A protein has these predicted regions:
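Alpha-helix capping and helix-loop boundary segments enriched in small/acidic/polar residues
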Residues: 21, 29-37, 49, 120-124, ...
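A short, structure-level motif marking secondary-structure boundaries and short turns
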Residues: 26-27, 46-47, 256-258
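Walker A/P-loop NTP-binding active-site region of P-loop NTPases
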Residues: 32-84
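P-loop NTPase motor domains
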Residues: 1-9, 15, 59-73, 77, ...
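Generic beta-sheet signal
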Residues: 22-26, 52, 212-213, 251-253
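Active-site-adjacent "gating/activation" loops or surface patches in catalytic cores
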Residues: 1-43
Length: 278
């Protein structure tokens, strides 16, 4: 990389000292070149075979993504994009368990038995899914409601296996009483009957096959709850693909304009930054 006056210097975000991790925050006033710096980092990382995923608001990375032959994904009216946050959460083939055992990773796995079938889930994946649904319900920082949502996820897995959707989680909750029923009703906008259901109900149709993928969220940025949920859903999809894929492949997830998600996703972002290093 180059310093402002053209001096060459070396910086490796994958170099870890002692008990540290690989997380990086970039701060600075508006217009000083934060996105330009990240673009430079992206091109450098790609030259070292690092896969790049960038969540952006404002099309700062559209040109560089297309120039590098990446996948530019725009969320908005008519985009036809679907990201079921529960897609890939449940594994019934044992692939997830085998991948983690082969890797020697410390990622915790839970086995759920439903009749004669066994399903495997990453507890980190369940935690992320719970946080996403918590954001949808506006139930953040309420341990009781979060526990009810987590229990509903497990009950839905027992009933539906790997065929999970937000609508099915909502039905499980609505079959309960009191707070559970209220949570299920609050999920309506994100179900197949709601205005945001188009983003979450169908199977995920994004492949993540390119070396660099940019998710442009400017068109949904005014709806803070939807923006927060979409950012979390994209992050969990990336996490599950990395978890079940080639564990030797390095990747970098960039959340530009992350401050916009802090009011609704601070817990999710904090927990992901702590666990993704595993």
């Amino acid at each position: 990389m180059q310093a402002p006056q053209g001096q060459l210097f070396n910086w490796n975000p994958f170099y870890k000292i002692a008990g540290g991790n690989y997380n990086v925050q970039i701060y600075g006033p508006s217009g000083v070149g934060k996105s330009v710096l990240i673009q430079e980092m992206a091109t450098t990382m790609l030259s070292h075979n690092v896969r790049m995923f960038i969540l952006d608001i404002g099309k700062s990375y559209e040109n560089i993504c297309k120039l590098l032959g990446g996948e530019f994904i725009r969320f908005g009216s008519g985009s036809g994009i679907s990201l079921n946050p529960l897609s890939g959460l449940v594994d019934e083939s044992g692939k997830l368990k085998e991948a983690i055992l082969e890797d020697g990773s410390s990622v915790p796995i839970k086995t759920i038995r439903a009749g004669e079938k066994e399903y495997y889930v990453s507890l980190d994946g369940v935690m992320y899914a719970k946080n996403i649904i918590t954001s949808m319900c506006g139930a953040g920082n309420n341990p009781h409601k979060e526990a009810l949502i987590e229990d509903a996820i497990y009950r839905a897995i027992e009933q539906c296996g790997s065929d999970l959707t937000i609508s099915k989680i909502a039905e499980v909750l609505k079959n309960g009483n009191g707070i559970e029923k209220e949570l299920g009703e609050t999920l309506l906008p994100f179900t197949d009957r709601g205005m945001h259901g188009k983003y979450f109900e169908n199977a995920a149709n994004i492949t993540f096959k390119e070396r660099i993928t940019v998710f442009e969220l400017e068109e949904v940025a005014k709806d803070e709850t939807l923006l927060s949920v979409l950012m979390q859903v994209v992050a969990i999809q990336i996490f599950m693909q990395v978890l079940c894929g080639d564990r030797s492949q390095k990747f970098m997830l960039v959340v530009d304009e992350a401050w916009r998600a802090l009011d609704h996703s601070e817990k999710f972002l904090a927990e992901m930054s702590r666990t993704i290093r595993k």
